[in-house]
Amino acid sequence: MMLVAALASGQTVSDALTFGQNNYYGTARTLGMGNAVTAIGGDLGSISINPAGGSVSAFSQFEFSTGWNTANSISSYSPSYDSANQSANYSGGFENGKTRMTMPNIGMNLCFETGNRSGILSWNFAFVMNRSQSYNQIFSASGLENHTSMTGALATFAAGMPGTIITDNNRFDSDYAWNSICAYDVGLINFNKDALSYYGSAETVTKTGTDYSYEMLGVLKQNMGITSRGSKNDVVMNYGMNIDNRLFLGVNINLPVAGYKYSEYYNESAQDPADFPVTSGYYTKDNTGNLSYVQGKPTNYLGSTYKYSYVADISGINAQIGFIWLPTDGVRIGAAFKTPTAYTVSEEWYVDMNAEFQDASENHNASSPTAETSYNFRSPYTANFGLAYTVGRHGLLSVDYELTDYSVMKFSQEYVDASFTYEDPFYRVNRLNKLFCGLQQNLRVGAEFRLLPSFSLRAGFSLATSPERHYSDNEGYIIYASDYDRWFDDYESGKYSLVASEYNPDKIVSFSFGAGYSSPGSFYADVAFRRTKLPDNYYSPYSNYLSHTVGGTVYDIVSPSVKSALSQFDAVLTLGWRF
């Protein structure tokens, strides 16, 4: 997955996948078996995958799970490069890790026997909370850069913003990006009134005739990183029934809730401040409202820091149905279907910047207000299919196949006045979701071996494909979602067209193992460990803003980026009582 630092507010394909994807936790038993439990059931963790799992138990139970999640990363840095004849050159091994305590499961399942000899033998009601995603992640890297800078990117993307906006007390209520406004406030970008353009404080201004050019002449040390935390949990109300100990049916009303916190930082510092001379340029307003253009004292740029913080609170509702059928004593077949989730997302975000110069009187810092917004989001539907074989009370082998269609993800406004005609603010991102997201396939395999009547060992494996895809276009270029977004109008108008699609080769691979103890009485305990290898993450602190033409073809100077190898380790302990 490729991430670019947020230079403006707005929803993205990455947001849709963050909110829509699941990575099941549940209990230590289900985790230890790789969550290949669609045809197994009998455990509170399995209810979130197949609602029929709650009706398999012949007894009532209460259980809770606790543990920890560790996110690890090994990152490398690549400076900018000319896409005409170069490629990324990653180096360095920056290791990061973060551990958080978790409570992935708690709940109760009540079983009621009917007394019938045939037909419906029992029914159950369960109230459970199962974790379905962890947002724990951290990575960072640093390196030297001598072609591009955050200040240059901010100056480029400020094009069209009036130089007088700095004098407007309501400037954050305008349509201009808050990054650009804050950068102008602190002096990271400056306004050239003669050229009617902005230049970065890390750039040298050259005038040739009536033309101006801006370039970076020195070397910057760049430091950057991302931290995220939070989780998504499904609050489940489950009802099921047991028919002749051969057919188990179940239905869920799921109420997923999530808290997601994300922050990114970027710092750049001049290796030799003498290479970065700068004279600020901006407008001021006196007490009578008269505007005047001011040029500051010549100084040298030392460095700057950029921070972006984002918080989202998410709640939703979906329905789920499933069955488990035993055609013979050893064979079990299961299937479940979950409707798309209707989410409400409430989010807050802000940016913070500071700039330092050799003349300390030019140093400034600025923060945007905290933006608040809410909207609706529709997540994908999910279908699960399972086949299992049990060997009496000695063990079992289970295989699951899960299919999720991410192309149906959709953002929408929370409140719409039907009496007004308006432009859909989410049309662009919804179009990208439909084109560049598709089917994700997930294969899960699990096994359980009962070594003693009271002791079992478990192992599991899962492999999930990427739901993201890319295209080749009529010009022969490979087009990702970010490319289509950049040239959106050209593709939508038919100037360019997409020809053929191919899914990204990224995979999510997990291995797990565990053990379980079941006492002769009511108590039982399970423990499980899982290691997950996530797709490599590519992050750029700012978008490409320089380019040149060779033989009629435009080539970007690709901005610096960080490549991170990501993994997670989970440990879960489940304690339960039957009654």
List where the protein language model places each region:
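Sec-dependent signal peptide recognition
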Residues: 1-2
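Outer-membrane beta-barrel translocator/receptor signature
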Residues: 28, 40-49, 55-145, 233
